[in-house]
Each structure stands twice: as structure tokens, then as C-alpha cells.
Regions:
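Conserved catalytic-core segment of nucleotide-activated headgroup transferases in glycan assembly
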Residues: 1-88
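Residues at the C-termini of beta-strands that transition into short coil/loop
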Residues: 11, 69, 105, 139, ...
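Donor nucleotide-activated moiety binding/catalytic core segment of transferases
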Residues: 72-131
């Protein structure tokens, strides 16, 4: 019996989806000025996503949890904060056999061999969905209520994903979908 596998296509909290620095010189009528406003809750959101995954790894030793960052993402303030979050919740990667960080793993093989995916604005979200696999978008209500959400690439296609409204809903979806081998037919059509 094959072990279930959950994959997070890692995204940094510093990505422009949550706002970017600069733009103070724009005229107040500039249509996209919100994009230069940093979402103040982005670090809390990031903490909630990663804490939920770590908790599930401890609670569900029968599921493998894979964090798939690009190698370049493992440098800088967002990755340092990721490590800080795990440290603050006393999550030791070396003591949990079913949690791994795999920057060099083949993405296409990972998609074919895994059961449930999580991503944000990555093309891998679409690739996994096209492969008939369930994909969770952790776009919690507190993010969806921001102006920055206007720039979320998949916002007009939420019906092809499972959308988590908050951290508990995110955890519930992961557990529910681990036994779901394909996406429902209404999503594929």
C-alpha cells in the first residue's frame, strides 16, 4: 500500500503577490498603487501555513509531507523566517521522518507520484490540476479581503481548486483530500 504524499510548492512571504517596496512617488490616482503596499499580515499568514503543515506531519505519520522550494528560495529573509517558524513551534525536521525539504526533486515526477498539492501562484498548481490531482490554494479570507488579492493569478479560476479559508480549513482539506485520488469531474470539465 503506497504512502500518501502531500506537497507544498514553497512560496516566500516576500513575493510581490503580498505587495512590494517602492512606488511612493506615484500619483494618488495611479490604479495599481496598492501593489506597492506590503500586506502587514503576510508573515502571520506564512506562519499559519507552515505551522499547519508541521502539525499535520506530527499528527499523521502515515502521510509524507514534502516542501518543494526552488533552490534560490532557500536563501534570504523568507527562508530564514521559515526556519525561525519551525524553531519557534519546536518542530525539528530531523526528528520527523515524514517531513522533508526537496529542492532538487523532479517536479513532474513529484506531481505524478503525489496525492495532494498546495501552491499559490505557481504554474505547478495548474500542472498538478491538469494531472487530475487535488490542489489546495491557501488563500485565506484575510488575504482575499486585501487589495493585493487583485493580482492573484488564479483568482478567476478558483473553481478548479480547493480553496482554504483559514488554517484549520487548510488542515481539514489536506486530510480530506489524502483519500481522494482524482479531482471531481465538475472541476475537470
Amino acid at each position: 500500500n503506497k504512502r500518501k504524499r502531500f506537497v507544498l510548492f514553497y512560496f516566500p512571504y516576500t513575493q510581490s503577490l503580498f505587495g512590494k517596496h517602492g512606488g511612493q512617488d506615484f500619483d494618488q490616482s495611479f490604479k495599481y498603487k496598492y501593489a506597492f503596499s506590503i500586506w502587514p499580515e503576510r508573515k502571520n499568514y506564512f506562519r499559519e501555513v507552515h505551522s499547519a503543515i508541521a502539525e499535520l506531519a506530527v499528527e499523521n505519520p502515515d502521510i509524507d509531507f514534502v516542501i518543494k522550494p526552488k533552490s534560490i528560495m532557500m536563501k534570504g529573509e523568507s527562508w530564514e523566517y521559515y526556519e525561525q517558524v519551525l524553531n519557534e513551534i519546536s518542530f525539528d525536521i530531523n526528528k520527523v521522518d515524514n517531513y522533508s525539504i526537496e529542492p532538487d526533486i523532479d517536479v513532474h515526477g513529484l506531481i505524478l507520484d503525489s496525492d495532494v498539492f498546495c501552491a499559490l501562484q505557481s504554474s505547478t498548481a495548474i500542472e498538478a490540476a491538469i494531472s487530475g490531482k487535488p490542489v489546495i490554494l491557501p488563500i485565506f479570507e484575510n488575504y482575499r479581503s486585501t487589495e493585493n488579492y487583485q493580482d492573484f493569478a488564479w483568482k478567476n479560476y478558483l473553481d478548479i481548486f480547493d480553496v482554504a479559508n483559514n488554517a484549520q480549513h487548510f488542515k481539514d482539506l489536506i486530510i480530506k483530500l489524502k483519500n481522494c485520488h482524482t479531482v471531481s469531474s465538475h472541476i475537470l470539465n
